[in-house]
């Protein structure tokens, strides 16, 4: 009799390849892990590469609570051309000589797009407008507007400015940039808006996500590597990286698992999700403080 395969619970940090949707990666991981219970936290455009956080088995319950509010990217912005999608995947809709744009002007434009800003997401995106994905409306040629949304760009740095010539002969500038931003920020839209501010248009030509919340690229594995050896971050380790920790004694652990709302120390008030750990180091549950007591968000013990 063969031993039944058991997929470990935990997070898988994937280095997503270009050309794959986030759903493609989930489908691939279901085959690798031999389970249907795989989900992802946050998405990456098909063109982009880098960190995509997946949850396997019980860890799928963790995904919705992960404090993945801050993300970090490396990318390339081309000044001098606009595209339909604000990235290199879309059709070029305008070209303008960008060779006279100065570094001072670029830095001033970047400064305007830093900090707490209102951003209009790209029209070719998954945002729903009256229940319909905006990319579907865009593909059908609809004329519509997406309301601006508040986002935070903690850091927007330009490392290099390179002269280049586009395929149609237009002199353009390629900027190598890094961005640290809140969840929901469109790097494509930053490229578009920087180009608009400089009067020459702009779009994103390359993007690599290097961090999502506490999970960095150095912990990520390619799909080929995961096919060879499935590397899963145990739930307890994943929770320790993402949430404040509350250690409880054996009695409190038992009460918590039986649904009793325990009194929580004041230090956890207003801190969002908190990981509860028993004396043996087992991750029991995610809770949040509500009127001084622990409200269960997800139970793992």
Swiss-Prot record:
Signal peptide bounds: none
Protein's recorded name: tRNA pseudouridine synthase B
Gene it is expressed from: truB
Pfam families: TruB_C, TruB_C_2, TruB_N
UniProt similarity note: Belongs to the pseudouridine synthase TruB family. Type 1 subfamily.
Domain of life the protein comes from: Bacteria
MF-aspect GO terms: RNA binding; tRNA pseudouridine(55) synthase activity
One BP term from GO: tRNA pseudouridine synthesis
Database matches in NCBIfam families: TruB
Residues at the catalytic site: 45 (nucleophile)
Keywords: Isomerase, tRNA processing
Organism: Streptomyces avermitilis (strain ATCC 31267 / DSM 46492 / JCM 5070 / NBRC 14893 / NCIMB 12804 / NRRL 8165 / MA-4680)
General function of this protein: Responsible for synthesis of pseudouridine from uracil-55 in the psi GC loop of transfer RNAs.
SUPFAM superfamilies: Pseudouridine synthase (SSF55120), PUA domain-like (SSF88697)
């Amino acid at each position: 009799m063969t031993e039944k395969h058991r997929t470990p619970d935990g997070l898988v940090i994937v280095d997503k390849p270009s050309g794959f949707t986030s759903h493609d990666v989930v489908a691939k991981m279901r085959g690798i892990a031999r389970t249907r219970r795989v989900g992802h936290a946050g998405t990456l455009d098909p063109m982009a590469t880098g960190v995509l956080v997946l949850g396997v088995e019980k860890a799928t319950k963790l995904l919705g609570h992960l404090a993945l509010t801050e993300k970090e990217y490396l990318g390339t912005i081309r000044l001098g051309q606009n595209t339909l999608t604000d990235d290199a995947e879309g059709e070029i809709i305008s070209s303008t000589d960008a060779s006279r744009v100065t570094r001072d002007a670029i830095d001033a434009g970047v400064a305007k797009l830093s900090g707490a800003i209102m951003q209009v997401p790209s029209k070719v995106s998954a945002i729903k407008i009256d229940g319909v994905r905006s990319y579907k409306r865009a593909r059908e040629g609809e004329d519509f507007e997406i309301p601006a949304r508040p986002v935070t760009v903690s850091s927007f740095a330009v490392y290099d400015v390179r002269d280049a010539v586009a395929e149609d002969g237009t002199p353009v500038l390629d900027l190598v940039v890094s961005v640290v931003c809140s969840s929901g920020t469109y790097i494509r839209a930053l490229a578009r808006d920087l180009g608009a501010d400089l009067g020459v248009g702009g779009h994103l030509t390359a993007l690599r996500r290097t961090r999502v919340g506490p999970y960095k690229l150095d912990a990520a594995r390619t799909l080929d590597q995961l096919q060879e050896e499935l590397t899963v971050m145990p739930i307890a380790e994943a929770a320790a990286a993402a949430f404040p920790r509350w250690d409880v004694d054996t009695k409190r652990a038992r009460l918590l698992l039986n649904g009793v709302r325990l009194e929580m120390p004041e230090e956890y008030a207003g801190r969002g999700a908190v990981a509860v750990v028993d004396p043996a180091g087992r991750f029991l549950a995610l809770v949040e403080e509500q009127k001084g007591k622990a409200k269960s968000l997800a139970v793992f013990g």
